Amino acid sequence: MADIQDYNSTPKYETFSYLPAMGPEKMRRQIAYLINQGWNPGIEHVEPERASTYYWYMWKLPMFGEQSVDTVIMELEACHRAHPGHHVRLVGYDNYSQSQGSAFVVFRGR
């Protein structure tokens, strides 16, 4: 329980922000879960000072039908390399409900 962060200490952008940082293996499992749900991965990024707004920039189009965790990770890293100072998040778009099934910040900007 000591690993849970105080909600006032850092900005929060989604549910996982209240937990300790995810390691690479936990990140892979979250991406695999998103794909296994049939959701389409999409990548978004934004400057840290604008992170609390509703509108983040989309990195390319959502990866419709993508089944490879490694491909999603490669795109996340490419977005982070192209925008190193930005927050980068992964969104799982649910075709059936026409909504976001999941969204979490993968890389935090400075």
From Swiss-Prot:
UniProt GO BP: reductive pentose-phosphate cycle
InterPro entries per the UniProt record, alphabetical: RuBisCO_ssu, RuBisCO_ssu_dom, RuBisCO_ssu_sf
Domain of life: Bacteria
Keywords annotated in UniProt: Calvin cycle, Carbon dioxide fixation
CDD domains listed in its UniProt record: RuBisCO_small (cd03527)
GO MF, one annotated term: ribulose-bisphosphate carboxylase activity
Note: The basic functional RuBisCO is composed of a large chain homodimer in a 'head-to-tail' conformation. In form I RuBisCO this homodimer is arranged in a barrel-like tetramer with the small subunits forming a tetrameric 'cap' on each end of the 'barrel'.
Described purpose of this protein according to its UniProt entry: RuBisCO catalyzes two reactions: the carboxylation of D-ribulose 1,5-bisphosphate, the primary event in carbon dioxide fixation, as well as the oxidative fragmentation of the pentose substrate. Both reactions occur simultaneously and in competition at the same active site. Although the small subunit is not catalytic it is essential for maximal activity.
Subunit structure: Heterohexadecamer of 8 large and 8 small subunits.
Similarity comment: Belongs to the RuBisCO small chain family.
UniProt xrefs under HAMAP family: RuBisCO_S_bact
Record protein name field: Ribulose bisphosphate carboxylase small subunit 1
